[in-house]
Amino acid sequence: MNTILVTGGCGYIGAHTIVDLIENGFDVVSADNNSRSNENILNAVEKITGKTVKNYKVDLCIYDDTCAIFQENPDIVGIIHFAAYKAVGESVEKPLMYYENNLDSLINILKCADEFAIPNFVFSSSCTVYGNPDAIPVTEETPMKPAESAYGRTKQMGEKIVNDAVNANKNNAILLRYFNPVGAHPSTLMGEIPLGKPQNLVPAITQTAIGKLPVMKVWGNDYPTKDGSCVRDYIHVCDIAHAHTLALNYLLQNKNETNCDIFNLGTGDGLTVLEIINAFEKISGVKLNYEMGPRRSGDVIAIYANNDKAKKLLGWLPKYSLQHMMDTAWKWELKLKDDEKIYNHPGRDIN
């Protein structure tokens, strides 16, 4: 039996990845302390897959508690590590909290992987490691520039930590640098559940459209882009999820040529914030109430991916269009309005 540990399994990308893993024949256990997620999302996983997933509600920054997961699950053959704080703006305001949480948890998981002889590790990294690149699209060989936020620096440091660890203990790892995951599962049974005021663009759009937020801020209108707003590479969360399954199989089948490999996960299309708003308005039929604001600390000007390597080596091909991303995100927001009690969390109060 091939069991995969997914840390942060109750989170947005983690839960979608669990679904994809199960649909591809894996057994899964989750580790998530639910400080920024909701364990009820695993009920949606069960509805979609017919499988119950156990979640260990532990703080991965505590080594002994982390070890207990592996002691109870000796059949774990791989780890996908999502668990981390991820809000760029918050990381600028609270950098030490980000360094402590994101790096301590990573180190503990890697120590356990070594102690319990688990050779396959997939790390949830980010395009923030590139900083403000000199040229776009970025390839995996694009030099890292200084990250614009503490969050980005934890990902830069995290990549180096993983690389050093697997080269020292002769294990294998893949670093997945993904760009901007959006959308929801096509079943509309699961999607993103922001805590507090949303930090990411699409939840801010959908919450404004449905009336949870009175107005949405577009941060910056003076960037050197086609309309003055930031450029990003938006990709459907299910495409991101499937890439993790492919990466894991790549390691399990010993296809990797190095101990630590890197893949970009993006569509390759750079879109401005205003273009995303326009796409949402066309799909939903809702005119969005937004206003322009100043630049936000930590944001890069423009970034999007060259994804040729993932296509060639992993056999990964993004299949969801921008229209599908906006459509599923909006349908999920409409459903979430009805399911508010199910996903109630102190941080959901956005007033």
What are the language-model segments listed below?
Residues H16, D20, C112, I161, ...:
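Rossmann-fold NAD(P)-dependent oxidoreductase module
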Residues M1-G78, K197:
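N-terminal Rossmann/SDR dinucleotide-binding element
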Residues E93-L96, E100, D104-K111, V129-L175, ...:
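Catalytic helix-loop patch of NAD(P)-dependent Rossmann-fold dehydrogenases
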Residues F82-K86, S125-S126:
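Conserved NAD(P)H cofactor-binding loop of Rossmann-fold oxidoreductase domains
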Residues V58, A204-N351:
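C-terminal substrate-binding subdomain of Rossmann-fold SDR/epimerase-dehydratase oxidoreductases
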Residues S37, Y85-G89:
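Active-site beta-alpha loop architecture of Rossmann-like, nucleotide-cofactor-dependent enzymes
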Residues V77-I80, V122:
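N-terminal Rossmann-like NAD(P) cofactor-binding module of classical short-chain dehydrogenase/reductase
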Residues I62, D104-N108, N120, M157-G158, ...:
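Conserved cofactor-binding/catalytic machinery of classical short-chain dehydrogenase/reductase
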